[in-house]
């Protein structure tokens, strides 16, 4: 009987999943995600790229385990591997053929690698003549920076490239700029040597993080991907929420929150999990624009989801000098509120459209699934345990990698014992190494560009200038400063992976908020939130565009829907700046609970206002024809009142909470009474 049920479950899931084969899925991912648009070499070229990738991973593991390589040499070697592989694997444009390797890409890859190996070979002499660089040093630096920009154009995209280029222009043109942007300007030699050879430039904190724990977490993610944890998470979420109203959308929210925290890229997560969840949502009855928006908003939210936050949590702990566990605790409540807001909106949309869930008898059962495949989450449990125990990110990642390998080989032993073909072996390890080496390329290049931005900030003092400028423009008013910081962070965050996003926004914009007496942790979280939300905010909205492409929907309409779904991310940061107890800073358990309850009520009110649907979708007015109620638009005044009640609830003041909760209760009571009078069926 159980076997029949599992068979029915599998048959039903196959019906609602996309019908495209694996090759079609790969093609879609290559079109939507720059990181997946790599060449697939054959024969000799394949062996060469595989060999370089494996050597790269072995070098990284050796450097991490031995600690015998100095920081600058490690970072330069890391960049040399990245630049070589970038041009061997990624074609010049999206439309370039992926089955050929032009001679000029080989040359560019070798030149890029040679520029960084120049530092490795001449490290001692470069240290001795620091500040007195030769013309050759300058020439190598110029070429290295230009090649880095070209690889950024190919793989990461134009937004971060344009931003970094603008900062370099700022360094040269300072004496021609007005107001707080004015500075004396710097020579070509000074700018190039500061960016290329200094640990405050390209080889600064971003690449330092990338060449150590970020690389290890990407390797860990590649191992998890090979074990099939993505499908496991989707199955678990289907078991938990698939049968609820609008089940597939809720599955998308839950699974993207779980997967997104590890991925480090909202676009990659949208493409990866969206290729399954978006067709499920459309099959159930959601419009394409809404289905793509749900996945984009949820995947973007995964980057602010503890415990890993796309590796930004470790960078934040290092930047602020705080324990990692403090960062995780601070991120918990905002993340809960963000996903609660999306969940409520998804539920209301399902009710408005009259969408049911997937038949429960045809969905996987939670406990049997957990007993059969629960071992897959063991590596994540290991990482979280060691991080919470106060171990370093590097140590925790290494333990997670070891746990992944042990689980993989354990499954293979079980396969052999039952006469099956082993599902994990030497070939899989090589594939995992190649995947990790390929996936680190975009992150490393983005971190290099972030290093350029941070390098110009440290050279010119732009961080202080911009902070003072924002405060001056806001006339010292906190609210206006927050608004200006929000806009600046969204612009700076466009197209940047999570780690680079945090480093750029926290370096440039967070200082303005801190200067007004706000907790540094709250200021950094504020800047980071809005940098991340750039992925669903028009006009760039890369995650929303990826979701729209999978859903075959209009990109701008999808981006607008994603922004509506992610409305919590535009409200929550203001809440924790004005009330740091939300970040569990000097907060009692009771105060945190009160904040969560009132904020969830507030998110409900705002979601009802945005959706135009609540306990009763006919608003103040309704029509009847032949004894049947005709559904008409939610009344504008009612929507405004729900929005006001919601905003009052999220404002962190006791008086506004009381007024907001009272108004919300009155509106809900009115809708319930109206529904009872009409004899309408319950909708929530």
PLM regions with names:
Residues 63-67, 89-100, 125-126, 144-158, ...:
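Membrane-water interface regions at transmembrane-helix termini and the short interhelical loops
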Residues 150-151, 155, 165-180, 188-192, ...:
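Core transmembrane alpha-helical segments of multi-pass membrane transporters/permeases
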Residues 135-139, 200-213, 239-253, 284-290, ...:
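Membrane-interfacial loop-to-helix junctions in multi-pass transporters
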Residues 1-128, 138-142:
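Conserved, well-structured core domains of diverse proteins
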Residues 49-54, 74-88, 104-113, 138-147, ...:
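Hydrophobic mid-bilayer segments of alpha-helices in multi-pass membrane transport proteins
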Residues 234-302, 308-315, 321, 498-530, ...:
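Hydrophobic transmembrane alpha-helices that form the pore/transport pathway of multi-pass ion
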Residues 2-44, 332-439, 542-645, 675-684:
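Long, contiguous bundles of hydrophobic transmembrane helices that form the permeation core
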